[in-house]
Amino acid sequence: VEIPRPVIEVMDRLEKAGFQAYLVGGSVRDMLLGREPKDYDIATDATPDQVKPLFPKVIPAGEKYGTVTVLNGIPIEVTTFRKDGRYLDGRRPESVDFSDSLEEDVKRRDFTINALAMTKEGVLKDPLDVQRDIWLEHIHCVGDPNERFNEDALRMMRAIRFACQLGFSISAPTYYAIRRNARLISNVSWERIRDELAKILLSERPCMGISLLGTSRLMQYIIPELSDCVGFDQHSEHHDKNVMAHIIETVGWTPNRLNVRLAALLHDVAKPKTFTLVDGEGHFYGHHLEGEIMAREILNRLRFDNHTIGAVCTLVREHMSRYEFLRPRNVKRFINRVGIDNLNDLFDLQIADIKASAPPHDFGMVLALKEDCQRILNEKEPLTVKDLAINGHDLCEWGMTPGKEMGAILKKMLECVLEDPGVNTREGLKKVFEGGFQ
């Protein structure tokens, strides 16, 4: 993977002005691995005040920490070499001292895979002699991992995220430092934890991520509600795995969409709470309803947006719906209950749930329900009051006084239409009205 021309131009202009300029961080790592970098960072001995006059378009956000963003076709972060002071808030250093040394700069980075640099000609610079970790596929802290995690506890989740994204293993010293320091994640804002969790779930190896969050003890501080699921025997012929193992495998079978993967992670969170044992057979009556309540608490705590919370909680609540024998009218109610936008996520969750259960795997009821829903949507059959051929004005014309009862009448008419779509005309609904809804 070559360095893009806009990045080379910025590096070249810095060098012509007498400054050092190196591509650093994740972009170098990704290029060495043959991956297309998502963004590009340049490190230099030039201060922000020296960088800004060199380029026509510069965003000064981050200037306090030595960073400005140069706009040259693409946004490129340019940061002054620096040495960090003590970290007092578990996120940012108390002070930032600018430096003129690339080696000093890379010493402050989190992991060795992010501590490499490259010239504009593509020559690799490795002041700490750590490039072997790229080829060994290791996630390893720069220096003492305990110090790195005390500086910023989110780095523990980042280590797991990089392992999931790159398919690397976490080195033993780094992994055991995560276990020792897991409690420190409680000092990190929920918003930052949420963002890392989402990246782990959307990686190519979400199962690895959830497993590592568990074994490293981080999960008990992030989603402690899942702790009871670990090793929980389901005592069921339908399940050949404990609850947490089933959850992890379900996540692995879902497509790479955040809502469905969050729902997979939380769909059985209430099983330990609702467990009963009758004649040696385990039952989890109402776990989908209790799970919806628990999922809402978890997602609110993690500061997910209301739309995501609503969608995921719907998926958790409805993940057992395939077991219902639904008449056409009830299929339409099901569509209304789930929401058209959530249907595909729900069916993907249900299929993943079955795949993660004990064989044989029967997808018949899920696929039949999916087919019924698709037919109803394709035929544009009425589903809500808004789809009725009449509205409140028509009811007024037919002699009804405006008020709360009007909404109730429209809902009753919708019930008739759900049963028989053919009645959804102005004339047909007027007959229904005259037949008993005055």
Q: Which ranges hold each PLM region?
A:
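Catalytic cores of the polymerase beta-like nucleotidyltransferase superfamily
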Residues: 1-438
